Amino acid sequence: MTDLRRNRYSISAGVGKSVLDSLGKFYGSPKRQLPNKFEAGKEYTGYNAPWIPFALDWLKQGKYSSEWIAMGSLNEEPNNMIQLLKLITGDDGNSHLEKAQAATDLEYPVTKLLWNPSSVGSNTDSQLLASTDQQLRLWKTDFEAGIDSPLLCQASLSTHVKTHNNAPLTSFDWCKTDPSYIVVSSLDTTCTVWDIVAQQSKTQLIAHDKEVYDVAFLKDSINVFVSVGADGSVRMFDLRSLDHSTIIYEGDSTFWKRNGDYTNASPPVSAPLLRLSACDSDVNLMATFHHNSSDVQMIDIRVPGTAYATLRGHKGDVNAVKWMPGSKSKLATCGDDCVVSLWDLDQPVNPSPAPTLSVSGTTPGMTGSTSEYVTPVSSVNSMRETASPLNADNQYSPLLSWKLEHEVNNLSWSVKNDGLAVVYGKSLEILKVPQ
């Protein structure tokens, strides 16, 4: 898709061939039949949805007797949904996902979901869930009431009185230092900070020259956040000084000339940056990736202007990157190559080519045999994966990887960091991460 504004929702999804053109392709192509991977009556650690899932978040609070996952749909029709799933572990140690009654219908695709961070001194059994589509919405459910508890909308926040005038919201982040604040990014080039207790916007600013695709608060801060957008830059803002922003990173400026857009733009801009993940253990570190790119850029705000490292391992476009909570060295990525990869920045790379690894079918969610260097793989079908030699300028290779059946659109870490929830096709699956 050469015209970024051709479809206003084509930038709000981030699946398949990236945030920019996936929905445009989805609308213009015949509907593809996606198989039901998890058969009825079999307890796999997975779930078949009647729609294509994208938005995803695993509840990070361990105070509940069960674990919960929220996921949202990406439907072309004005019929979208948020569904809660309960992860149940039996006495034999095997787990399966159970559909809860907590679900709700929405008109527009859900671009992001996040459970509220832990609040100091909070002892309530109710939990807040935030979502974005045309509005920032807050939902509430009572986990102690079990899977029959409904998902109730507590607020729908918008800077416009008329909802149909809203530009789609692409992403948001919950402030972990003060959960009463949420920052939201939009296609209209703005970021808005909301006080969800007062249900009022604290400030709205023009964050980028073009559409904003993702936003994140920095560790331990209620004032500083970073954003990425179609202008190809990572920008940092301080709510105490909004008269300027700091450009932390800008990529290659030849993108638009290669793709036939904005050839007369001055100055030239780089390939759009689609998603951003800020490390919650080191305020200086974050990860991002470009449109139509299989690489992940590692950013250190103490060294602005360039990526301090590039993660190269995917064979297709990257769709998501997430730091492991509580870690400043481990993160997970997924992409159009149907692969989920775990990276450890503290692990040295062996300079010899990674070995060829054959893996036969395994139980969904379980890892296959491991290699000292790279890529144990999980698959329902037998497969062979041949790893290529590392590029000379690549400092890292995946610690391990899983090969799935379709493009992997999103992922989320478990509360104990021992699992990854991933969505692909019409399925959600839990991958067990070796400790």
Swiss-Prot record:
InterPro entries associated with the record: DCAF7-like (IPR045159), WD40/YVTN_repeat-like_dom_sf (IPR015943), WD40_repeat_CS (IPR019775), WD40_repeat_dom_sf (IPR036322), WD40_rpt (IPR001680)
Compartment(s) of residence: Cytoplasm; Golgi apparatus
Gene3D superfamilies given in the database record: YVTN repeat-like/Quinoprotein amine dehydrogenase
Highest taxon above the source species: Eukaryota
Compositionally biased tracts (Low complexity): 358-371
Alphabetically ordered keywords of this record: Cytoplasm, Golgi apparatus, Phosphoprotein, Repeat, WD repeat
Residues bearing PTM Phosphoserine: 266, 388
Main location: cytoplasm
Gene Ontology cellular component annotations, sorted alphabetically: Cul4-RING E3 ubiquitin ligase complex; Golgi apparatus
PROSITE patterns according to UniProt: WD_REPEATS_1, WD_REPEATS_2, WD_REPEATS_REGION
Segments of this protein annotated with the region Disordered: 352-371
Stretches forming WD repeats: 105-149, 164-204, 207-247, 313-353
Name of the protein this chain belongs to: Uncharacterized WD repeat-containing protein C17D11.08
Phylogenetic placement of the source organism: Eukaryota, Fungi, Dikarya, Ascomycota, Taphrinomycotina
